[in-house]
Amino acid sequence: AFYDKLDASQKRLLLKEVQKNGTKFFNRFNNHLENHIADNHVWQMAFRIFTMATFSVYGDLPEAEVWADYCYNLWVARFPGLNQDGAWHNGDSYFHVNIRTLIEVPYFYSRISGYDFFSDPWYEGSAMYVIYQQPPFSKSAGNGSSHQNVLQPNGVRVGYADALARLINNTYSADYVRCILQKESDLLRKAFMAKTGDLSWFRLQNHTPLPEGRKMKDLPLAYVFPQTGVATLMSDWENFSRNAMLTFRSSPYGSTSHAIANQNAFNTFFDGKPLFYSSGHHISFTDEHSVYCHRSTR
């Protein structure tokens, strides 16, 4: 963004640092990341940072040509999600730390290639996941590590819904955003500088208006994400203070890490507040409290 503002010595310094650190990243990722089921921290931000650094020095560093080929093909092969239904395998809390990657990387590729990377059906499913797993003013549906801390849709989540609404012309997401911002008008500002979730830079570049059309009240009262094993049932899309909701999860075989797999687990809510819900925290992925309480296994 400020390339023409840098003097020659500043450019040399930046190229030297990108070359040094980019080489470390590539040597760490190559023949590992593409074969790893879900290297969480890399996907959350390191891969996005490496991708942007790579293209920023393309034409200046010879290594960048190899890096760019790797980054692009890895994205096409493995992302946006590790499934096809649009739900997030690691649950609602860890979903939030992937949001900048899920928007900024495909938006960049779309701009330089002319191909719409958001045409992947996964993003339509992701829009439904955002809405059904945490309706306006509701606590999280309750799956994955740290889900108990996701109390109401925050600025990061609403910012993601805002971006999806504009990028895939999803009117349900647009209604979700309008509904929440009507009561919490400064919510997007609260996400500013969240290193994995702030989409302010995207909003400065994209001026597509929020679409108009069908609203949340037109959605079905139940939705299933079969590959992730998650389902939500509710009673009212118009009066959230009177909405009764039940969420269900039965993890697919092989769930790992922050997914903290569970079987036939359910949570119940009224007015966005949990009635029957998982309790507390987990010390490790397999401690007794994690297995019997945090995973909400019943």
Residue locations for each model-derived region?
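Aromatic-lined, polymer-binding surfaces characteristic
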Residues: 1-134, 139, 146
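Extended polysaccharide-engagement surfaces of secreted carbohydrate-active enzymes
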Residues: 89, 94-298
